[in-house]
Amino acid sequence: SRTYGPECDYTKVPYDYTRTVMPTNKDTRPGTPSGTAEPTPPVYQLTIIGGFTDAFHFYPVIVRDSIATIYLHNNMLEYGHTYYVTIDNGVLNLADGSFQGVTKEDEWVFTTKSDMPELSDTLIVDVAGKGDFNTVQGALDFIPDFNEQQTVILVNPGDYEELVYTRNKWHVKIKGAGMADTKVHYANNEVFNPHPLTVKTNEWPGTFPSRRAAFMLDNCKDIVIEDMTIATDLKGQAEGLLINGERIALYRVHIIGSGDALQANGTIYMESCELDGGGDTILGRGSLFAYKSNFRNGGGPFSWVRNTAGNHGNVFVECTFSTEDGKQADYGRTKSNHGSAYPDAEFVLIDCKVKNIIPEGWSSIGAKTAKMYEYNTCDMVTGNPVDVSKRHPYSRQLTKDKDTELINNYRNPAFVLKGWVPDSCINGTK
């Protein structure tokens, strides 16, 4: 994992999300700095995704067995054009030496669609090219920034190996065909796409955006994602899904990450979701409400909550938390890697079931002011109430007799999510 330089700090001015035109690889050199960052070194291949000019490292060619898939720089092709493909001798090799490349005389050509689709209320993504776009990123790029019209992106069954980053999108639903049928994934992490050497990322609103997740929503509002799997294929600091936005709803989404598998900043609602990750499974300063969702990690803390005073943190109702037998997990920590604490951090479990959680519940709570609450936690295997006699002294067990109003408030998404009432089975609107 990359470390911060001695002069590295958060940007002193809010990151500028205003733009009238989305920059692309056609008109802007990948690595061109935005915000207060320095240029991204052009040591490896870079591509601009979603208008983020600092750009991303990507894999121009991915080889699996005898199949080589070539990925072009984003947004470079024109509608209604014919292109030819050449591959120099030696770029790709077969064991028997029979492949000598592709020349122009081989006439390997392809033609793009004659024109772009109309901006309608529904766009179709199909990996085989039978829709309006064959990538999720392509459909998101097509939708104007700050669009007030509701747009539905239907993602057909398929394996979408792509790095997704989108900013300034409003009122978009991204709907797959099911967790087992639609998968969006990429091999990305903090080492492959690190933060700038001189700028820290993502701690507070207005700081420099992160580039290390497989799927990133940045400065977005009123987004729904449902019925798909979103995953990173690498270990380390590697989110499957990274959210910076308001009123982001996830339904029946399987998120697979490593450390910081889900980064949640803003207001986020999850229902009937699955999350698999490593330590600090959920990271962020946002308000997250999860209902009937399952959380798994390989041991260690499930969260590193950083919400501030006046904002709720993470609340879980009728969820499960588990790790495999032979390992132990905990609800989370509030202390930073340098020993300081987030004094207003909030992590609340209501009617949840757990397996292989340490007796203390939380590994570290750095301040008595943190709201680490628990009510009616039961064992996933036996169904019996868990033994809470050794819980962390800064945590609190809620009781029906004394805390009925507070328990009921925590069962209400609007209480946690700044008054937002998402579609939800918990309140009969889903």
Identify the residue ranges that each predicted region occupies.
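Sequence-level preference for short, compositionally simple segments enriched
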Residues: 114-130, 134-430
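Acidic, low-complexity Ser/Thr/Gly/Pro-rich repeat segments typical of extracellular/periplasmic
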Residues: 1-117
